[in-house]
Amino acid sequence: MARVCEVTGKKPMVGNNVSHANNKTKRRFLPNLQYRRFWVESENRWVRLRVSSAALRLIDKNGIDSVLADMRARGQA
């Protein structure tokens, strides 16, 4: 699926553009996705993930091994 974070599952949301005159038109809020390579020391290889900026902070906090273990438990990696 396009534009989905592989770690957090964040997807585009739907909302409104609101003008100064309070006119509303539909728009999409896209997650801030980046392709990023992570070195996995336990597997001695690089892993390439499409992650949101929130997922990058999660990986910094918990470590890539912990995040990959959670993804594998969900059946995503």
From Swiss-Prot:
Query: A Gene Ontology biological process annotation?
Result: translation
Annotated Gene Ontology cellular component terms: cytosolic large ribosomal subunit
Q: Check the record and name the Pfam families matching this protein.
A: Ribosomal_L28
Domain of life the protein comes from: Bacteria
Keywords for this protein: Ribonucleoprotein, Ribosomal protein
GO MF annotations, alphabetized: structural constituent of ribosome
Entry similarity comment = Belongs to the bacterial ribosomal protein bL28 family.
Q: Which PANTHER family match?
A: 39S RIBOSOMAL PROTEIN L28, MITOCHONDRIAL, LARGE RIBOSOMAL SUBUNIT PROTEIN BL28M
- NCBIfam families in UniProt: L28 (TIGR00009)
Q: This protein is called what?
A: Large ribosomal subunit protein bL28
Q: Which gene encodes it?
A: rpmB
